[in-house]
Swiss-Prot record:
Superkingdom field: Bacteria
UniProt keyword annotation of Magnesium present: no
One Gene Ontology term of the molecular function aspect: ATP binding
UniProt name for this protein: Chaperonin GroEL
Organism: Edwardsiella ictaluri (strain 93-146)
Gene Ontology BP annotations: protein refolding
Job description of the protein: Together with its co-chaperonin GroES, plays an essential role in assisting protein folding. The GroEL-GroES system forms a nano-cage that allows encapsulation of the non-native substrate proteins and provides a physical environment optimized to promote and accelerate protein folding.
One Pfam family, short name: Cpn60_TCP1
EC number(s) on file: 5.6.1.7
Sorted UniProt keywords: ATP-binding, Chaperone, Cytoplasm, Isomerase, Nucleotide-binding
Record bears the keyword Membrane: no
Amino acid sequence: MAAKDVKFGNDARVKMLRGVNVLADAVKVTLGPKGRNVVLDKSFGSPAITKDGVSVAREIELEDKFENMGAQMVKEVASKANDAAGDGTTTATVLAQAIVNEGLKAVAAGMNPMDLKRGIDKAVSAAVEELKALSVPCSDSKAIAQVGTISANADDTVGQLIAEAMEKVGKEGVITVEEGTGLQDELDVVEGMQFDRGYLSPYFINKPETGAVELESPFILLADKKISNIREMLPVLEAVAKAGKPLLIIAEDVEGEALATLVVNNMRGIVKVAAVKAPGFGDRRKAMLQDIATLTAGTVISEEIGMELEKATLEDLGQAKRVVINKDTTIIIDGVGEESAIQGRVAQIRQQIEEATSDYDREKLQERVAKLAGGVAVIKVGAATEVEMKEKKARVEDALHATRAAVEEGVVAGGGVALVRVAAKLVDLKGINEEQNVGIKVALRAMESPLRQIVANAGEEPSVVTNNVKAGEGNYGYNAATEQYGDMIEMGILDPTKVTRSALQYASSVAGLMITTECMVTDLPKEEKADLGAAGMGGMGGMGGMM
């Protein structure tokens, strides 16, 4: 086991505080509409330019191990805020720095750290309740666009794109962000259910100009098995041909004689047909087939429940208004399934989301909800260079997380105003002793720090602006972009309540632990041994005689 270096008391706290300040100072320059960029050197490729707090925090490692521990703990604040709400990482870092700095001053003055922490926790709990009371629901497109714009660093085209995407696919819909190929941002919306499986044979294509298969008002056969024998399918094919409608087959696989016969029948015009593999694998495939069955009012033909393909009738087939299939994807538009059945299925999947233990499972289940409930929107980010593309894509993703958080828990006045108002309401909050009261004051003073930092980054005097904002009431605040005072909500400067709440809770949690630290332990740096290689080689000179 390696030898350890141990520091106690003030020595430990001073080192830790230095690390906290190095990381927080690097992150906080990005806060607000006039925040600056940070350039991150990469071991390969060109440097990355970002205004995203958590991206900056993740890059910072300090040489001094005690200072690095302080930096890593603040990095944890940014990461947790990012995981919880997808945004607010810089705010969380600024809050943590303010609480740690003020708290450690109180500890140095002889206060009991445990009571200080209890005071901080008490103030934060009360602040969270006040934030919830201040929160306003965010449901209309205008508010969603404003939240997206603020989170994307005052880029209103991003805000509009996200609002448009949410309007098209609903609040539950899947919205993904991809790198585009042009200079302009684009929004592609896929209405209906899309899954990543294309046609099994190019001979099914009936739209050569687009290389796609389009079926109008088709029947949909869902089979949880491989189909290789055409005899199994003859009764269904004959019934569909009589009905004069096209047929889409979704099965584990269609191969051999069955696929060849379908292709021949399709090319001769006897029955218009296309076949695709079912999406997913194993249990997930069974579940997704059931989703499609619910959407199209069909039945999954499965031997597990005693159904045979030969006995399938038109009543077992699903139906949709239209199906579009290309090389890689299938889209089912306007399935005829009943709304009540679809909502029941969605509720069932939501229950599974709550019980899911892994992020991967949760993500896949949420995708299934979106495909059933709304649709899929893809925002394609346009930029002139790869460096700009990466920076912009990160901003759009942040803005998307922020708007989702806003829809979930509502919005409060932005620009750090909500926390200033909350702190003003808690001035009379008291603990059970003087040290807890100091802890409460530490937390309330820290709540002004985001506003102060936004103002400082805009090149103004933080104390003057903070006092002016405190003199006002309600949503009255300072717009750093235009350097004007006014109603923040009317000016469209909104923060999601969830983002502000998460930033405050995670900052106080980690900062409270740091204030109560009395001892720090780390590995001693290993001494590099002298390079003995050259000296050892000298003895090999005598080998000359062996030649």
